[in-house]
From Swiss-Prot:
<protein>
    <recommendedName>
        <fullName>N-glycosidase YbiA</fullName>
        <ecNumber>3.2.2.-</ecNumber>
    </recommendedName>
</protein>
<dbReference type="InterPro" id="IPR037238">
    <property type="entry name" value="YbiA-like_sf"/>
</dbReference>
<dbReference type="Pfam" id="PF08719">
    <property type="entry name" value="NADAR"/>
</dbReference>
<comment type="similarity">
    <text>Belongs to the YbiA family.</text>
</comment>
<dbReference type="InterPro" id="IPR012816">
    <property type="entry name" value="NADAR"/>
</dbReference>
<comment type="function">
    <text>Catalyzes the hydrolysis of the N-glycosidic bond in the first two intermediates of riboflavin biosynthesis, which are highly reactive metabolites, yielding relatively innocuous products. Thus, can divert a surplus of harmful intermediates into relatively harmless products and pre-empt the damage these intermediates would otherwise do. Helps maintain flavin levels. May act on other substrates in vivo. Has no activity against GTP, nucleoside monophosphates or ADP-ribose. Is Required for swarming motility.</text>
</comment>
<dbReference type="GO" id="GO:0016798">
    <property type="term" value="F:hydrolase activity, acting on glycosyl bonds"/>
</dbReference>
<keyword id="KW-0326">Glycosidase</keyword>
<keyword id="KW-0378">Hydrolase</keyword>
């Protein structure tokens, strides 16, 4: 690799790409971004709709979440604790997110290209609203969404 290419590679490795709002430069990485996904024969308006619905075993309630008008409403319904969460939710939530992300980035070529073009930058869901999926706003959160996107980016690059 030429020296200049090595320098560019090094700069990109140190690059952090923050995303959160759908209006951000990389807002399409947000689960709230309006990219429909088809999973198990059903079309979901956003990956957020799909993810929130999977918290519940009640098929009728899952369908209600699928049909709501916005990902914000879907997220609110996902926090409804008057409905019982599936017992294994904590152990399967990352698997569910992986499935949603894979569907989103496989089914939309332009999104896949955008994700692949970010390599090898670190992807960070930058928000103080979430210290599990995001960075907690201060960098101390787990940033699991960012890490799952980087994992998917690696897989898609290999499959290319």
């Amino acid at each position: 690799m030429p020296v200049r290419a090595q320098r560019i590679q090094h700069v990109m490795q140190d690059t952090i790409i923050n995303f959160y709002s759908t209006s951000d430069d990389y807002g399409d990485f947000s689960n709230f971004a309006a990219w429909p996904i088809k999973v198990d024969g059903k079309t979901w308006p956003t990956s957020e709709h799909y993810f929130q619905a999977q918290k519940f075993l009640d098929e009728k309630y899952r369908e209600e979440i699928r049909r709501v008008s916005s990902p914000m409403v879907a997220a609110r319904m996902g926090r409804n604790r008057s409905k019982p969460l599936r017992k294994n939710w904590e152990s399967v939530k990352e698997q569910v997110m992986r499935k949603a992300l894979r569907a989103k980035f496989e089914q939309h070529a332009e999104l896949r290209a955008l994700l692949l073009a970010t390599a090898p930058a670190k992807l960070v869901e930058h928000t103080e609203n979430d210290a599990y999926w995001g960075d907690g706003g201060n960098g101390k959160g787990k940033n699991r969404l960012g890490y799952l996107l980087m994992e998917l980016r690696e897989q898609l690059a290999i499959e290319k």
